[in-house]
Amino acid sequence: MKSRDTLIRLKKFQVDEKRRRVAQIEGMIAEFERMAADLDREIKTEQERAGIHDPAHFAYPTYAKAAMQRKENLKRSADELKVQLDDARAALGEAFEELKKVELLDERDQARERAEENAREQADMDSIGLMRARLGAIA
């Protein structure tokens, strides 16, 4: 049983690690999306300030062009992280399934041990009852 308890603790630790990884990736994606939204606002502000909204225009603000490039890089990075997130979620699901298998085996073993203990107790009680019945018949 002790080895099973250790295995359960290990599986729980693995599930927790995978949950942390999923949360970390989700946080990074959210941060990249927030930064991209901030850059979007800055681009709009710069376009309004310059009065030019066409990126192909020769006088389009350089800062707005650079901000657009950074925004695209952030979106590309967020998309790459989404692939990693899918993988991390799949790994979390697998780790959770493994944990459940081990827990079910442990529950089954405990139920079997309880049934065996109950059977032993019942046998003891039966033998006590039988002895009392014999003593009562003798007396």
Ranges and model annotations:
Residues 1-139:
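Charge-rich amphipathic alpha-helical interaction elements
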